[in-house]
Amino acid sequence: MNNDNTEVLENYPQDGLQSNSHIIWKGIQSRLHKFYGNAIYDSWLSVLLYVSTESGKVLLSAPTRFIKEWILVHYLDQILKYWQDEDQSICSVDICVVSNQDPNLLVDIKDRVDRGIKGNCDNVSSPLDPRFTFDNFVVGKPNELAFAAARRVAESNSPISGSNPLFLYGGVGLGKTHLMHAIAWYIIKSCSKRKIAYLSAEKFMYQYVTALRSKDIMLFKEQFRSVDILMVDDVQFISGKDSTQEEFFHTFNALIDQNKQLVISADRSPSDLDGVEERIKSRLGWGLVADINETTFELRLGILQLKVEKMGINIPNKVLEFLAKNIKSNIRELEGALNKVVAHSSLVGCSITLDTASDILSDLLRANHKSVTLECIQKKVAEFFNIKVSDMYSTRRLRTLARPRQIAMYLSKKLTQKSLPEIGKSFGGRDHATVIHAVKQIEKLMDTDSKLRDDINLLNRMLR
């Protein structure tokens, strides 16, 4: 039986290994590599495999549905163009998702992308995401320790004193899984003989229960205790599951005794894992505990810039800044917002601007909506122009202070229900006439000063 992410190839005719179409495809791959560069080709296009050609229709395969859909949106037109350059009878190119267990496959996809697991660990490991590598991980203050520790584990041929286990913890979507996949990919690509097993704690529990029911518990133990590196994601899942905790405890001890490396992740520190036995929490804290903190604006912007670069598309930096300042919950949601904007632009055929991004993400932004207060406006404007909040109340008339103050008054008038006297009072006891003057001054300048207009539009979106 195939899973939901697999499309069966039985109905597709497949060419012989040495067919002319295979030769054409190799040439097209070279052209795609040259056209898009290493980053995009390695991340997306290198995993495409040629399947068949029939009645002017070319069929390629991708290892996952996500990769298939991304290529269909962003790169299919260029692939079709190159095919038609070689064969004018080609009218379309389609992509299917294949199973790494299908006997008709022309290459072993397991060794390419979909599995990425070595040795006899295939039955216990989960697939690795080809996007999750060290090169694709943006490092900043919130995650630099976790990144350095993960990289060190990957580069070392044996467990490092003080880093076994490596315990990564942080909120949802902050990069824990990315780093665990990156460790595995680094080892795989370095042609190391080390055996790796990566899986979630939920899958560990499921396989343990299955082994108990089928009376294969010794095989289960052998599989997990024969690895060189065991990586268990979201270990908080075993909370309250006594028998699973018992087996995890013994597996942990067995691997440590054999001088094998463990990498564990959770959404909280070992000491905060409620429902997990004290002896397990103690062992999880034996090595290096590295937290991944909430992202900063600079880190979020860097993540977006790297993602856009790998997509091979141009998006105005103001749009990226808008996303980075408004989508703060986690990296997964941030990247999802960018994907939504890019997909909408590609499908509808519109350019990406602040207005279109705001419209496309209106639901997401509304979900994060907070009531706008005068204090919030003053703080945001001060932060935007790199001045002190106290400058909003001061009597200093320096242009670098007066203009942001006027902008804050303008936004206060537009975004709140406060009266002019109330607004004036919040800006150091100024009267309503001062507020009216500020509003009119900003409105006048916005007609002629495009940069000021853009800044105010961006602030407007950030505050809503």
Swiss-Prot record:
Q: Show the PROSITE patterns listed in the entry.
A: DNAA
Q: Show the segment(s) annotated as Domain II.
A: 90-126
Q: Name the SMART domains for this protein.
A: AAA, Bac_DnaA_C
What organism does this protein naturally occur in?
Ehrlichia ruminantium (strain Gardel)
**Where does the source fall among the domains of life?**
Bacteria
The written remark on domains in the entry is:
Domain I is involved in oligomerization and binding regulators, domain II is flexibile and of varying length in different bacteria, domain III forms the AAA+ region, while domain IV binds dsDNA.
Alphabetized UniProt keyword annotations: ATP-binding, Cytoplasm, DNA replication, DNA-binding, Lipid-binding, Nucleotide-binding
GO terms for MF: ATP binding; ATP hydrolysis activity; DNA replication origin binding; lipid binding
Q: Which GO terms describe its cellular component?
A: cytoplasm; plasma membrane
What name does UniProt use for this protein? Chromosomal replication initiator protein DnaA
> Where is ATP bound in this sequence?
173, 175-177
